[in-house]
Regions:
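Generic alpha-helical transmembrane segments of integral inner-membrane proteins
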Residues: 7, 71, 124, 128, ...
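C-terminal transmembrane helix and the adjacent membrane-cytosol boundary/short C-terminal tail
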Residues: 83-94, 98, 168-198
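Membrane-helix interface segments
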Residues: 1-4, 62, 92, 104, ...
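Interhelical loop and adjacent transmembrane-helix boundary motif
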Residues: 139-190
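Residue-level recognition of pore/gate-forming positions within transmembrane alpha-helices
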Residues: 12, 70, 115, 144, ...
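Membrane-interfacial helix termini and adjacent extracytoplasmic/periplasmic loops
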Residues: 20-71, 105, 141-145
Length: 198
């Protein structure tokens, strides 16, 4: 359990840009992953089955690379609040539910999930706010082809489509959306702090 927690926290000890650069090294055309695929013959097998002539799997500058980078960078911020709530669960409630005839799925749905919702809400808040405004990941792993809201705002101020008024308007709308989402999630989290109904 402690080893798994350390593995989850390990990326947080590195700089955000270094973590993203490491994925560039892994995913690029002559990167570690494509070299591994070449050595085990996966690329040759793919070419044989589908009749292609690929030298490598194109993984950089794709939507999948951007999603992978965002998941890798922000997953610890989701897991840690949930872990901190689950580790404090009263195990007597779980035992009582099982004694009353509840199955594993029912125990999870009616006991564990309601009690862990404050951690889930906290994790969603911690992940949503930075991920909705990021632009470094999409630029580095997506090559500028996969635009996020942060990229759109950055282009209005620093890019070729110079339009600071539009950039300011998008920023304001995004800030309002983030604040509304945080208020809703906080209210939702408060509403879930109630007795567990079996």
């Amino acid at each position: 359990q402690h080893i798994m927690l350390m593995l989850v926290m390990l990326p947080m000890w590195m700089n955000f840009l270094l973590r993203t650069y490491s994925w560039m090294t892994i995913l690029e055309n002559n990167g570690l992953l494509n070299q591994l695929f070449q050595k085990i013959g996966l690329i040759s097998l793919y070419n044989h089955i589908f009749g292609t002539n690929l030298e490598y799997f194109p993984m950089m500058n794709t939507q999948g690379a951007v999603v992978l980078g965002m998941v890798y960078n922000y997953l610890p911020f989701m897991i840690l609040p949930i872990y901190s709530v689950i580790i404090k669960l009263d195990h007597s409630l779980l035992e009582a539910a099982r004694d009353l005839g509840a199955g594993s799925l029912t125990v999870f749905r009616r006991v564990i999930l309601p009690l862990s919702l404050p951690g889930v809400v906290s994790g969603i808040t911690m992940v949503f706010v930075p991920s909705v405004s990021t632009f470094a990941i999409s630029r580095m792993l997506g090559g500028g082809t996969e635009l996020l809201l942060g990229d759109l705002i950055e282009r209005q101020f620093l890019g070729g489509a110079y339009n600071p008024q539009l950039g300011a308007a998008i920023s304001l709308v995004m800030m309002i959306i983030v604040l509304v989402c945080m208020l809703v999630m906080n209210r939702f989290g408060e509403g879930e702090e109630q007795a567990v109904k079996l």
